Structure formats: structure tokens, C-alpha cells
UniProtKB/Swiss-Prot annotation:
The keyword Disulfide bond does not apply. One of the essential components for the initiation of protein synthesis. Stabilizes the binding of IF-2 and IF-3 on the 30S subunit to which N-formylmethionyl-tRNA(fMet) subsequently binds. Helps modulate mRNA selection, yielding the 30S pre-initiation complex (PIC). Upon addition of the 50S ribosomal subunit IF-1, IF-2 and IF-3 are released leaving the mature 70S translation initiation complex. It comes from the Bacteria. InterPro entries: NA-bd_OB-fold, RNA-binding_domain_S1_IF1, S1_domain, TIF_IF1. It holds the Pfam family eIF-1a. The gene is infA. This is Translation initiation factor IF-1. Belongs to the IF-1 family.
Length: 72
């Protein structure tokens, strides 16, 4: 059985939480808890409240996600 593909959607950072986690409001007005992907962490890209980001969400649990890109 193949693994389901992640859903990619854009959102805005609402607040920064401990352990490199963020509360993100998605463009469909859903709020998710998201952590930073390894590449963003590796390159020391700062993410602040108000930043527009791309989030990957698993189809199995839509309350959690992974931030994969920060728009300039």
C-alpha cells in the first residue's frame, strides 16, 4: 500500500511556540500546529509571526503540519 501524498497549502504564522513550533492560520481559515523542516533549520532561516509560509499537512492528521518554505 502506497503512502498518501501530503497536502501543500499556504498560510500565515500567528505565533511562535517553544521547540521551533508555530501556530499557522491556513488560507482555508484552519489553524494548525506546524514544525520547521530540516532544510529550513539547517540554513538558519528565521520565521517570525506574520510571515507567509507553505505548509505540508498529512491527510491522516490535519491538525499538524511541516513548514517547508517561507515566502520573501
Amino acid at each position: 500500500m502506497a503512502k498518501e501524498e501530503a497536502i501543500e497549502i499556504e498560510g500565515v504564522i500567528l505565533e511562535a511556540l517553544p521547540n521551533a513550533q508555530f501556530k499557522v492560520k491556513l488560507e482555508n481559515s484552519l489553524e494548525v500546529l506546524a514544525h520547521v523542516s530540516g532544510k529550513i533549520r539547517m540554513h538558519y532561516i528565521r520565521i517570525l509571526p506574520g510571515d507567509k509560509v507553505k505548509v505540508q499537512i498529512s491527510p491522516y492528521d490535519i491538525s499538524k503540519g511541516r513548514i517547508t518554505y517561507r515566502y520573501k
